[in-house]
UniProtKB/Swiss-Prot annotation:
Gene name for this UniProt entry: mutS
InterPro entries: DNA_mismatch_repair_MutS, DNA_mismatch_repair_MutS-lik_N, DNA_mismatch_repair_MutS/MSH, DNA_mismatch_repair_MutS_C, DNA_mismatch_repair_MutS_clamp, DNA_mismatch_repair_MutS_core, DNA_mismatch_repair_MutS_N, DNA_mismatch_repair_MutS_sf
NCBIfam families: mutS1, PRK05399.1
Descriptive protein name: DNA mismatch repair protein MutS
Residues bound to ATP: 617-624
Function of the molecule: This protein is involved in the repair of mismatches in DNA. It is possible that it carries out the mismatch recognition step. This protein has a weak ATPase activity.
Length: 891
């Protein structure tokens, strides 16, 4: 930004600091206020709703000003960060009382959407990830860091893999090379906060050295990243950004985990959204997370979000989780003991981070001690359980007894939220501190004693000893008794009805008291700093405790879901079979009225006999719910949860793909046929033998012919794919697809049943073998409140179209067509209505698909049937097409 002409020393200092962070809002500490100036003040006043004013800035100059009290920082800072602003906090670096010149100021922290440890900025149930993406020609690196927890990860892969990670981890801020910003936007279409860094911040060699330096290593083999140069480049960019934002205390970032796509089920952004895993698509709806998250600690809440979007592909790890859930399910007493003590732990993970960064408050130090005390009974239950995996988890809990006992001895149990706001260090810790406190806190007794002494000496019964900030300690005498005042008293202030005096004894006492308070503050600060330093020695075991508690909390949550919702333990194995008996949708079931049972359904899929199920049925019958519940049950099984069914066997799934139709809450701007085809293409290009594929109403965004053709060919492709036979559910209103059952061995028709009783729809919501020939669209339109005359007219038209279809079917040759592809019935599936000269359909006319007796059409048909396509040259084809055009024109 251009440097304005400035006059006052304060504003000169402000603009010098502002020039170093032109893209951040600068909160400039002036006395007891944080002030913003110029453009920052205008922006801050709009976001924070604070008054915008102006102040003089030298001769004939004014500058915009907006500010708030320093103690309100925790209130206003989150609002700026959530608005996507970077905020530079500029504090006074020296005591204004000790300098006669301009107070020295400097940036103490740069807070951004992705880099914050402020509790009011952070969400307790979500991670606050900062991401960096390094862009290569084909391979991209990605690194993610939550500075508030110390979680640091890196990986690399193609653009699709990076997009999946961005979708599932939901970083609050992404770092990109400035020269690659345009390409990044074209590839990922990220709508969140992006920060462009200079290209040097993504230097491959420099960033490798930066990562090695942070961990004090000579090789990254221990992290499994030695050969992943793009991943390491991204990780180095994250560390460079922390340097830039003045975050230098990073002892809690103790490891760099490799993001390995082979460990987890592939879920793309469309699947996460359409299955409503983390958030509902409709306002007031519920997500899977809302239903199964019964975690107690913030660490558990954050962990379960990650587990949901990263299901496991290793049956052994899945079964290990299941066995712990089973133990908790069958042992309610142990479950209750652990749950009770988890409530006492709080956010241990972020407390450890604050301790490592030297920012833990006295009150938080007490909470850390409470958390460590709560770990002991939890460890006791776990290590004595008759379940091996739970014992292993309990063995990871470090009680850190020395630290716990030290905090118990040295910190007041009711310690204040900050140093200087009350006593922090307990009595008996330091003899000097105890002496100073005795001196400072005995003031009331001393003043009462002095006051009584002077009353007796002077004979003034109304004499009063008091204190204020202006004059300090003084003796007040009413005017009626001022003739009794001793000569050695010094008059300090004259009031209307009284005089105020000081004495040498009072002056000495005041100096002693005020000096003691300053010494108490300094000594408490020193003793507390030593305690924080001791805590920092325990960062690694405390982080291990946090991880173990998070996992324990999630498994306890799964057991609670099983208890509440009648979930069962599924079998997860290496087979290719999905066999669900009486499966239920975990979210919809919990939203039904108490007296309305959920209609359960069976699903069987494999790769040998029943690979593809075509599901037909009317709107509102439950087709979409059936598809989604199959995917959700499979996903829940592979995160280690119990599932809503009577029994379930899940042959391990390595990817779940979904494609929902345009009416199924596709966000605005994406409900186009092109996007539908792009998503379908993405699925077809990434199929594996273990994929689970859900197509819901594919092809509705175009004409009927086009839609049927595309849907038909996709089912054929999935069935005939030589490399993979993915298990597939295909819900459709194109009843013509039912013909595929007779042509493709592993395709089977099912329908979600509905009945029309006395002109009213009865949705049975039961999956039955066989295809459906009716969509009951008109009945659904009636239920939706469509005007009666429109419903009646639609009914008449439907009857005529059905009669015409029956007529055509009767005229079809009875010979069996052995060719694969749609029958003549499907090909002639688009009837037309005769119209008058204004284009309106003529009521009462016989409807027809084609004017079959039209001689022109008969001639064209004969011309086409007589063609020998195998011997036709391109030129002859064009000539024949021209002949047909002449026939249509009538010459």
């Amino acid at each position: 930004m251009a440097k304005p002409v400035v006059e006052t020393p304060l504003m000169r200092q402000y603009f010098q600091i502002k020039q170093k962070h032109p893209d951040a809002i600068l909160l400039f500490r002036v006395g007891d206020f944080y002030e913003t100036f110029s453009e920052d003040a205008i922006v801050a006043s709009e976001i924070l709703g604070i008054t915008l004013t102006r102040r003089a800035n030298g001769a004939a100059q004014f500058v915009e000003l907006a500010g708030f009290p320093h103690h309100a920082l925790d209130t206003y800072l989150p609002k700026l960060v959530r608005a996507g602003k970077r905020v530079a906090i500029c504090d006074q670096l020296e005591d204004p009382k000790k300098t006669k010149t301009l107070v020295k100021r400097g940036i103490t922290e740069l807070v951004t959407p992705g880099v914050s440890t402020n509790d009011n900025v952070l969400s307790h149930k979500e991670n606050n990830f900062l991401a960096a993406v390094s862009c290569g020609k084909e391979v991209f690196g990605i690194s993610l860091l939550d500075i508030s927890t110390g979680e640091f990860m890196a990986g690399q892969g193609n653009a699709d893999y990076v997009e999946k990670l961005l979708t599932n981890y939901r970083p609050k801020e992404i770092l990109v090379e400035r020269s690659e910003r345009s390409r990044f936007n074209d590839l990922f279409h990220w709508s969140g906060f992006i920060f462009d860094m200079e290209d040097w911040a993504f230097s491959s060699e420099n960033n490798r050295l930066r990562v090695l330096k942070h961990f004090d290593l000579k090789s990254l083999k221990g992290f499994g990243l030695e050969e992943l140069s793009m991943a390491v480049t991204a990780a180095g960019a994250v560390l460079n950004y922390l340097d830039l934002t003045q975050h230098h205390q990073l002892q809690h970032i103790t490891s760099l985990s490799r993001l390995d796509e082979n460990r987890y089920v592939r879920l793309d952004k469309f699947t996460v959204r359409s299955l409503e895993l983390l958030s509902p698509m409709n306002e007031g709806g519920k997500s899977l997370l809302d239903i199964i998250d019964h975690t107690i600690t913030p660490m558990g809440a954050r962990r379960i979000r990650q587990w949901i979007v990263f299901p496991l592909k290793d049956p052994a790890r899945i079964q290990a989780r299941q066995r712990v859930v089973e133990f908790f399910f069958r042992h309610p007493e142990e479950r209750a003991i652990i749950a009770e003590h988890l409530t006492e732990i709080g956010d241990l993970e972020r407390l450890v981070t604050k301790g490592a960064m030297g920012r833990i408050s006295p009150r938080e130090m007490v909470q850390l001690r409470v958390a460590l005390q709560a770990l002991e009974p939890i460890k006791e239950v776990c290590t004595h359980a008759d379940e091996e995996n739970l014992r292993t988890l309990g063995g990871k809990l470090e009680l850190c007894k020395e630290l716990r006992d030290k905090i118990l001895r040295e910190v007041m149990p009711d310690a204040p939220a900050a140093l200087g706001r009350g006593p922090v260090i307990a009595h008996g810790v330091d003899a000097t501190l105890d002496e100073l406190r005795a001196l400072a806190y005995s003031g009331k007794d001393y003043l009462i004693k002095l006051q009584q002494q002077e009353i007796e000496r002077t004979g003034i019964p109304s004499l009063k000893v008091a204190y204020n900030n202006v004059f300090g300690y003084y003796i007040e005498v009413r005017n009626t008794h001022k003739d009794k005042v001793p000569a050695e008293w010094i008059r300090k202030q004259t009031l209307v009805s009284a005089e105020r005096y000081i004495t040498e004894e009072l002056k000495e006492y005041e100096a002693k008291i005020l000096g003691a308070e300053e010494k108490i503050a300094a000594l408490e600060g020193q003793l507390y700093a030593l305690l924080v330093a001791e805590l920092q020695r325990y960062v690694a075991p405390l982080q291990q405790d946090s991880q173990a508690v998070a996992s324990l909390d999630c498994l306890l949550s799964f057991a609670e879901s099983a208890r509440r919702y009648r979930f069962i333990c599924p079998v997860v194995d290496e087979s290719f079979t999905i066999d669900i008996k009486a499966g239920r949708h975990p979210v919809i079931e919990q939203q039904l009225p108490a007296d309305e049972p959920y209609i359960a359904n069976d699903i069987y899929l494999d790769t040998d006999r029943q690979q593809v199920i075509i599901v037909t049925g009317p709107n509102m019958s439950g087709k979409s719910a059936l598809l989604r519940q199959t995917a959700l049950i499979s996903l829940m099984a592979q995160i280690g949860s119990f599932v809503p069914a009577e029994s379930a066997r899940i042959g391990m799934v390595d990817s779940i793909f979904t494609r929902v139709g345009a009416s199924d809450n596709i966000s605005m701007g994406e409900s186009t046929f092109m996007v539908e085809m792009q998503e379908a293409s993405n699925i077809l290009n990434n199929l594996t033998p273990r994929s689970l594929v859900l197509f819901d109403e594919l092809g509705r965004g175009t004409s009927t012919y086009d839609g049927i053709s595309i849907a038909w060919s996709i089912v054929e492709y999935i069935h005939d794919n030589p490399k993979a036979h993915p298990r597939t559910l295909f819900a459709t209103h194109y009843h013509e697809l039912n013909e595929l059952e007779g042509q493709l061995d592993r395709v089977h028709n099912f329908n979600v049943s509905a009945r029309e009783v006395d002109g009213k729809m009865l949705f049975l919501r039961k999956l039955e073998p066989g295809g459906s020939a009716h969509s009951f669209g008109i009945q659904v339109a009636r239920l939706g409140g469509m005007p009666h005359h429109i419903v009646q007219r639609a009914t008449d038209i439907l009857h005529r179209l059905e009669q015409e279809r029956e007529k055509i079917e009767e005229e079809e040759p009875k010979t069996k067509d052995t060719k694969r592809g749609p029958s003549e019935k499907v090909k002639n599936a688009s009837p037309t209505l005769p119209r008058d000269e204004k284009g309106r359909s003529i009521d009462g006319y016989q409807l027809s698909f084609f004017q079959l007796d039209d001689p022109v059409l008969s001639q064209i048909r004969e011309e086409i049937l007589d063609l020998n396509i195998d011997n036709l040259t391109p030129l002859e084809a064009l000539n024949k097409l021209n002949d047909i055009k002449r026939i249509l024109r009538g010459y």
